[in-house]
Amino acid sequence: MSQFSFTKMHGLGNSYIYVNMFEEQIPEEDLALVAEKVSNINTGIGADGMILICPSDVAPVKMRMFNNDGSEGKSCGNGLRCVAKYAYEHKLVEETVFTIETLAGIVTAEVTVEDGVVTLAKIDMGAPRLTRAEIPMLGEGETPFIRENFLYNNHRYAFTAVSMGNPHAVIFVDDVEKAPLTTLGPVLETHEMFPERVNVEFIEILNDDEMNFRVWERGSGVTQACGTGACAAVVAAILNGKMERGKEITVHLAGGDLMIAWTEEGNVLMKGPAEVICRGVYEYKIEA
């Protein structure tokens, strides 16, 4: 029987099991199965996935994120805020501004601290990727993929594709509560046009600086929040002329609010909370 210490954290209800790989060891070949096991709500701890906080050669810490189906993702906005909180509070970093390595690249985190506790984290998510090759999508073309039609159940849905280090398909609707989240979501997620699958967001514009947001995440299904998805939604809204670049936009997710801005300089900034749920030791056995 193997075991490791963990911290379960969430960003707006998007929860992961966090493992400090500065102290713990999980064999590389076991990571996918361990992520699937520990995330199981019935036989594990229950979460949207597992995130490893690892040493890095190019930053103070590195984040590796696994979905609850065992697949590894390249980035996770809510996860990055929680990693930033963990790293500062566990003295893996000393400054309130520091970098985090991800499979999608290096991002900059800034934490707000009160009495030694991180109450808010802001992440510079970098510039959005908008070409088919960068998202990635099948086909050629260097222009952004904006409001392209997708036929489902005899209804045409127009979506805009954005990558924030992971791929997103953003669909604007009149009411997110009536959006086909659990039906169209998995169909679009696994469509052949997205070779790495895709996260699917449904967006309802409320006014010039507010939107409602619901998400079907690749590898996880419906979740309470998706930080990179909120960033992609704001970028898509601006590309479609629905919102103004440079303004801070409030994104109302099922789990709470994020503040997102696509700056004139090109990067996307995400600000929001990160909270600890519980800590403990997880025991597991890998069958031979």
UniProtKB/Swiss-Prot annotation:
Location of the protein in the cell: Cytoplasm
Pathway where it operates: Amino-acid biosynthesis; L-lysine biosynthesis via DAP pathway; DL-2,6-diaminopimelate from LL-2,6-diaminopimelate: step 1/1
Isomerase listed as a keyword: yes
Class of the enzyme per the UniProt entry, highest EC level: isomerase
Catalytic activity, as annotated: (2S,6S)-2,6-diaminopimelate = meso-2,6-diaminopimelate
GO cellular component, one term: cytosol
The family this protein is said to belong to: Belongs to the diaminopimelate epimerase family.
Record function comment: Catalyzes the stereoinversion of LL-2,6-diaminopimelate (L,L-DAP) to meso-diaminopimelate (meso-DAP), a precursor of L-lysine and an essential component of the bacterial peptidoglycan.
Protein name: Diaminopimelate epimerase
Gene that this sequence comes from: dapF
